[in-house]
Amino acid sequence: MSLQAPKGTKDLLPTESYKWQYLENKFRNIAADFGCREIRTPVFEYTELFQRGVGETTDVVQKEMYTFEDKAGRSITLKPEGTSPAVRAFVEGRLFNETQPTKMYYFTPVMRYENVQKGRLRQHHQFGIEIFGAKDASVDAEVISIPVGIYKELGVEGVELNINSIGCPKCRKTYNEALKKYLSKNYDKLCSTCKTRFDKNPLRILDCKVDTCKEIVKDAPIILDYICDECKDHFESLKSYLDVLDIKYKVDPFIVRGLDYYSKTVFEFIIDDITICAGGRYDYLIEEIGGPSMPAVGFGMGIERLLLTLQEKAIEIPEEAYVDLYLGNIGDKAKLEVLKLAKELRDRHIKCEIDHMGKSVKAQMKYANRIGAKYSMVLGEEELNTGKVSLKRMEDGKQIEVDIKEIDTLIKVFK
């Protein structure tokens, strides 16, 4: 029996990788426009990081993490999200001693043991932005504007932005009491997981995906009615900044996000009832992980879901030719010359392909066409004797004669 990739994973083949490269380059350029620099963190962390950061009562920690003991008996988890590792690196690297804010971006695989579904695999990939050290709502608006710009540049229409404030620990305590009072009337109808959450973290019940629980929370108290003046002012400021930036949004008081580290601002970008990007503020996570008290805000965007959206919207990602010149040859002597010529051109960063298979000229040209080469030429005995060769533009068949030794002339064609 042939081996297959594990369930919930997918190989990225050369026929698809150009799409990822295109998006990654676009993300990098946009992140740089906002002053963000790249961070890379390990694919696994100590389990405690996610227990403390994401939250013991969350579905991520309770049900979805890939956790195991290493040979030294330490509990290790494949990272299920990108923010906690970025914060851990920020603290461990003592970047809080630098002038703030610190702006980071990353591309990372994340692993969650969950049902494989449309646009979500057990190993999927995220593009994320994290900004540390700024508490003003203007940075929340700036972070939100990044996905807005990405979707606009890609031509994705119909994306809705939903925002909410879940307050701070002080005002959330008051809300939790009101929420528990409401939920107690239907306690027996809650799922077993939410019954556990009832005492430990009732806010998580608002995020439950079980139909009976979703029905119960429809008439639950609105958290915006309970947030303190400071959190209220922050949320009103955010809305004002979004208005100034001409970013349309809807206030959804039931957005709480599935991770415990969020405070104040939370947001989701939704298209066709699917969340394709989400984030918020996490002003207490840095301190929770061992750093100083410092505000932060960020988001994560699923790359697979974005690619699926582009496909459904019939938005094509341009595929650049990955070969500038196909160098064909006839005979062993010509092959030696082609090898030397290819080396000279590659040294000048011209992408070349040559024949290693001993194919006929017809088969070589067929291959050149299949790989999307921009130009082709074939060296044989006649070309070696005259020092001249026909350079063919594959797009329209137009040919020009060039001197084999005039490398600079060839370079000009490709530049």
Swiss-Prot record:
- Extract the SUPFAM superfamilies matched here: Class II aaRS ABD-related, Class II aaRS and biotin synthetases
Which GO terms are recorded in the biological process aspect for this UniProt protein?
Answer: histidyl-tRNA aminoacylation
Q: Where in the cell is it found?
A: Cytoplasm
Which keywords does this Swiss-Prot/TrEMBL entry list? Aminoacyl-tRNA synthetase, ATP-binding, Cytoplasm, Ligase, Nucleotide-binding, Protein biosynthesis
> Gene encoding it?
hisS
For this protein, the record's InterPro entries field holds: aa-tRNA-synth_II (IPR006195), aa-tRNA-synth_II/BPL/LPL (IPR045864), Anticodon-bd (IPR004154), Anticodon-bd_dom_sf (IPR036621), His-tRNA-ligase (IPR015807), HisRS-like_core (IPR041715), HisRS/HisZ (IPR004516), HisRS_anticodon (IPR033656)
Report the main location listed first in the record.
Answer: cytoplasm
Q: EC number(s) on record?
A: 6.1.1.21
| Family, per entry | Belongs to the class-II aminoacyl-tRNA synthetase family.
Name of the protein: Histidine--tRNA ligase
Source organism superkingdom: Bacteria
Q: Name one GO cellular component term.
A: cytoplasm
Q: Which reaction does it catalyse?
A: tRNA(His) + L-histidine + ATP = L-histidyl-tRNA(His) + AMP + diphosphate + H(+)
Q: Which Gene Ontology MF annotations are present?
A: ATP binding; catalytic activity, acting on a protein; histidine-tRNA ligase activity; transferase activity
The protein's assembly and partners:
Homodimer.
Do you know which NCBIfam families this protein is assigned to?
A: hisS
